[in-house]
């Protein structure tokens, strides 16, 4: 009955009925999921001001885990508004199941292009059933996939969102294994660590840490290496891939993905079936 109402009721707008159908069909966790994702993020702003970066760890109705990190142009409140808007639009469209190219065209058209107001956007969608990760990059820093002693750098050449209406993201994919770690960071943190090669070397030394410990250690190291330079907003998100265990199936609720003030410290968040 509920599914029929969601499909056919004339008073329900189409965009909401589509979401209702997805939620009704996907409300139960998949019994076939073989992976579990735990993730954490950290943000830091110069001298305690507003951080222009925004991050989120989401679980879509169909079971996908979506990691998002955005860096608004500039610093302070203006940058934060830009990054929050870009991230909110990406979250909304991707959770509804739109493919990435359609979603990012819509984001670009809804953004303030032409007024030099743009934001980078770094997204990773993880399917815990198939073990596939898809990376969407719009003007963002590389994403690192750590596996044992090796590191794969995932890069893209696309423009930030809001620059060109028809721009699409750079897209890559990877097959995940238990023990893998996914690292996403903004340019403030990567530059503070000494650039991409130095950041990669640092990340590899932390490959066995929990996501929360990984993020905390990376921010601390970035601050210590960057004492003489003008500080920038710094953000990092770390996700750890684990083999699913029935004993861990009751995951805590995910936090609000866009808090009024990005937290300096956020505990590990369990996501996935």
Question: Whereabouts are the PLM-identified features?
Answer:
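Intrinsically disordered or compositionally simple regulatory linkers and C-terminal tails
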Residues: 24-34, 38, 241-272
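Short, surface-exposed beta-strand-loop junctions and turns on beta-sheet-rich folds
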Residues: 73-74, 140-143, 150-152, 160, ...
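Catalytic core of PPM/PP2C metal-dependent serine/threonine phosphatase domains
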Residues: 1-29, 80-149, 155, 169, ...
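Active-site-proximal, acidic helix/loop segment immediately C-terminal to a metal-coordinating Asp/Glu
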Residues: 74-96, 165, 176, 180-229, ...
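Short hydrophobic-aromatic micro-motifs
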Residues: 65-69, 135-136, 182-185
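Short, solvent-exposed secondary-structure boundary motifs
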Residues: 42-49, 111-115, 132, 162-166
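N-terminal entry segment of metal-dependent catalytic domains or homologous docking segments
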Residues: 10-73, 78, 84-88, 167-173
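Acidic loop->beta-strand submotif enriched in PP2C/PPM serine/threonine phosphatases
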Residues: 49-62, 118-121, 153-195, 227-231
């Amino acid at each position: 009955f509920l599914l029929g109402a969601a499909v056919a009721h004339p008073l329900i707008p189409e965009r909401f009925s589509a979401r209702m159908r997805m939620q009704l069909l996907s409300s139960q966790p998949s019994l076939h999921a073989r992976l579990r994702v735990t993730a954490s993020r950290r943000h830091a702003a110069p001298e305690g001001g507003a951080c222009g970066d925004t991050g989120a760890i989401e679980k879509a109705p169909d079971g996908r885990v979506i990691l998002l990190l955005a860096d608004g142009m500039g610093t302070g409140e203006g940058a934060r508004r830009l990054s929050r808007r870009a991230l909110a639009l990406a979250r909304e469209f991707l959770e509804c199941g739109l493919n990435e190219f359609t979603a990012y065209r819509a984001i670009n058209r809804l953004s303030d292009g032409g007024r030099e107001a743009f934001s980078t956007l770094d997204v990773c969608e993880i399917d815990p059933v198939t073990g596939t990760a898809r990376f969407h990059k719009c003007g963002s820093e590389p994403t690192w996939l750590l596996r044992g002693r090796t590191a794969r750098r995932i890069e893209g050449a696309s423009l930030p969102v809001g620059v060109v209406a028809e721009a699409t993201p750079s897209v890559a994919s990877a097959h995940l294994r238990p023990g893998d770690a996914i690292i996403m960071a903004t340019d403030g943190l990567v530059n503070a660590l000494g650039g991409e090669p130095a950041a990669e070397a640092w990340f590899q030394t932390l490959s066995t840490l929990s996501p929360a410990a990984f993020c905390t250690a990376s921010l601390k190291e970035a601050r210590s290496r960057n004492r003489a330079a003008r500080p920038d907003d710094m953000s990092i998100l770390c996700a750890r891939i684990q083999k699913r265990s029935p004993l861990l199936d009751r995951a805590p609720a995910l936090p609000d993905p866009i808090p009024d003030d990005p937290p300096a410290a956020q505990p590990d968040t369990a996501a996935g079936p």
